C-alpha cells in the first residue's frame, strides 16, 4: 500500500499536502462520490482528539467529518467487478462502514489516497487506503493489489505496520491499518540528524523485520525512510507492501520496481538481498 506517512515531500509514489493546507477544502470535494447521499457529523476538536493518543499533523478544526461510506445498495449482486477482488476484499455491510468518520488526509499517491479515520465503535484512529478499482484494472495491478493484503494478513511482528481490515465498495477498495503520525523521513527532515545510538536501534529493528519477512519468503522491494513509520514509543513500523512478493524457496523476482528517486544501478538485480539496500 502507499506509504501511510505524514511526510510533506514530493516523490513518485506519495505526494502529501503542504503544511497549512485546508484539508477540509479542495481535497474533500473530490471525494464526495464516496459518501454521497449521506449526512455529516459535526464534532469538536476536543471530542475527536479525546478518543485517540496520536498528535495530528494539522491543527485545524476538523468539521464537518464526512462518513467513509459508498452509496448504500438494497441488494448487491456479485458481478465480475466485485468477484474479481474476492476473497481479499470482501463486501462489508453498510452499517459497518457508517462507523468510520474521516478526520483528514494523510497522503495521496498515484495508486490511491490514504485517509485518517475515526472508528466510532472502537473509539480508535486508523489509516485507510482508498484505491479506485478502475485504476487497478487499467494498470493491470489486480494480482499485486490482492497480494499486498494477502501478505499483510500473514505477518505478525511488532515492527511491522499491522493490517486491521480490508473490504470493497462498488467503485473502491479499502485497506485499513493502524495509524502512525510520524515516519522516519519526516523525523530526519525535522531534526536534521540522528544520534548514533538511535541509528543503531533503527538498524537493529529494521534487520529484525527483514529477516522475519525473508524467513516467510516475503520480499518488500520498496524499503525507504518514507515507508518506515514510528509508533508513539519511537519504534519502527515497516509499511507499504504494495510492491512486495511472496516467493517459494530458491525462487527469484526479476521485476524492476521501487521508487524512482531511490533506484540505483544494481536495482535490476532484485531478490531477497535487494531489501538490504535502502
From Swiss-Prot:
It catalyses: L-seryl-[protein] + ATP = O-phospho-L-seryl-[protein] + ADP + H(+); L-threonyl-[protein] + ATP = O-phospho-L-threonyl-[protein] + ADP + H(+). Residues 100-278 form the Protein kinase domain. This is Ribosomal protein S6 kinase-related protein. Keywords: ATP-binding, Kinase, Nucleotide-binding, Serine/threonine-protein kinase, Transferase. It comes from Mus musculus. One of its GO terms (molecular function) is protein serine kinase activity. It comes from the Eukaryota. SUPFAM superfamilies: Protein kinase-like (PK-like). Belongs to the protein kinase superfamily. Ser/Thr protein kinase family. The active site is at 222 (proton acceptor).
Amino acid at each position: 500500500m502507499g506509504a501511510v506517512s505524514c511526510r510533506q515531500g514530493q516523490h513518485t509514489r506519495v505526494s502529501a499536502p503542504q503544511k497549512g493546507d485546508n484539508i477540509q477544502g479542495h481535497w474533500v470535494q473530490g471525494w464526495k462520490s464516496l459518501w454521497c447521499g449521506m449526512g455529516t457529523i459535526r464534532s469538536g476538536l476536543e471530542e475527536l482528539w479525546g478518543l485517540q493518543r496520536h498528535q495530528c499533523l494539522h491543527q485545524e478544526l476538523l468539521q464537518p467529518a464526512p462518513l467513509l461510506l459508498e452509496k448504500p445498495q438494497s441488494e448487491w449482486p456479485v458481478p465480475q467487478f466485485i468477484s474479481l477482488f474476492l476473497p481479499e476484499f470482501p463486501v462489508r455491510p453498510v452499517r459497518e462502514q457508517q462507523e468510520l468518520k474521516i478526520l483528514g488526509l494523510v497522503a495521496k499517491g498515484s495508486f490511491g489516497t490514504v485517509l485518517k479515520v475515526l472508528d466510532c465503535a472502537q473509539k480508535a484512529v486508523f489509516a485507510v487506503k482508498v484505491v479506485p478499482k478502475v485504476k487497478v484494472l487499467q494498470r493491470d495491478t489486480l494480482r499485486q493489489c490482492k497480494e499486498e493484503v494477502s501478505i499483510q494478513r500473514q505477518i505478525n511482528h511488532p515492527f511491522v505496520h499491522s493490517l486491521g481490515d480490508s473490504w470493497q465498495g462498488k467503485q473502491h477498495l479499502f485497506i485499513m491499518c493502524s495509524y502512525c503520525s510520524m515516519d522516519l523521513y519526516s523525523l530526519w527532515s525535522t531534526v536534521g540528524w540522528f544520534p548514533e545510538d538511535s541509528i543503531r536501534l533503527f538498524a537493529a529493528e529494521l534487520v529484525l523485520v527483514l529477516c522475519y519477512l525473508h524467513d516467510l519468503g516475503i520480499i518488500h522491494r520498496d524499503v525507504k525512510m518514507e515507508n518506515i513509520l514510528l509508533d508513539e514509543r519511537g519504534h519502527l513500523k515497516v509499511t507499504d507492501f504494495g510492491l512486495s512478493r511472496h516467493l517459494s524457496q530458491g525462487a527469484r523476482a526479476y521485476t524492476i520496481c521501487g521508487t524512482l528517486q531511490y533506484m540505483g544501478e544494481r536495482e535490476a538485480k532484485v531478490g531477497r538481498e535487494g531489501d538490504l539496500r535502502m
